[in-house]
């Protein structure tokens, strides 16, 4: 297992937040799994931590056929937000923005850059699309907030995957 820690910029003085990605296995195929983008949706995070243990076992036994990237805590910003004893993980307190909205829109700029380059070779098309998504992300101006930086990191990992899972649990979770 490889742990990739991304320090989020724009922290408050004397503080730091980190987005941790756990990478298991090797190969050309990749599955990307993130949990708790709404940081108050804790069942997804719990499931991801249990999956983390299982993936470590599978990797140590050589049973993984490809790469699995797991982000059990996809939103360290929201996980750290509390107001008068209540967890506030759905919206960023400073801006009021929903953590699961306002990701960079890639489809239009990617389509424009690719133009008519897609052909009959599906694998070559996948490579071209992923490279172009990376190119678009690289060409963006610097993020203006910690939320923007976090979104871009999550998006970059997801864009490289063959399968992406975003674990959510609605408002009713854990309530009788």
Predicted features, each with a name:
Residues 1-176:
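Structured catalytic-domain cores with a bias toward divalent-metal coordination
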């Amino acid at each position: 297992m490889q742990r990739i820690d991304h320090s989020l910029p724009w922290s408050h003085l004397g503080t730091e937040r980190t987005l941790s990605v756990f990478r298991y296995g090797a190969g050309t195929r990749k599955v990307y799994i993130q949990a708790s983008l709404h940081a108050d949706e804790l069942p997804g995070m719990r499931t991801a931590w249990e999956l983390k243990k299982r993936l470590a076992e599978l990797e140590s036994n050589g049973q993984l056929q490809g790469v699995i990237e797991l982000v059990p805590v996809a939103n360290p910003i929201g996980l750290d937000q509390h107001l008068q004893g209540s967890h506030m993980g759905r919206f960023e307190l400073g801006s009021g923005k929903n953590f699961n909205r306002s990701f960079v829109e890639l489809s239009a700029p990617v389509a424009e850059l690719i133009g008519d380059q897609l052909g009959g070779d599906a694998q070559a098309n996948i490579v071209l699309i992923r490279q172009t998504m990376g190119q678009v992300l690289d060409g963006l101006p610097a993020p203006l907030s910690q939320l923007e930086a976090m979104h871009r990191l999550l998006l970059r990992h997801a864009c490289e995957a063959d399968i992406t899972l975003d674990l959510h649990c609605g408002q009713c979770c854990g309530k009788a």
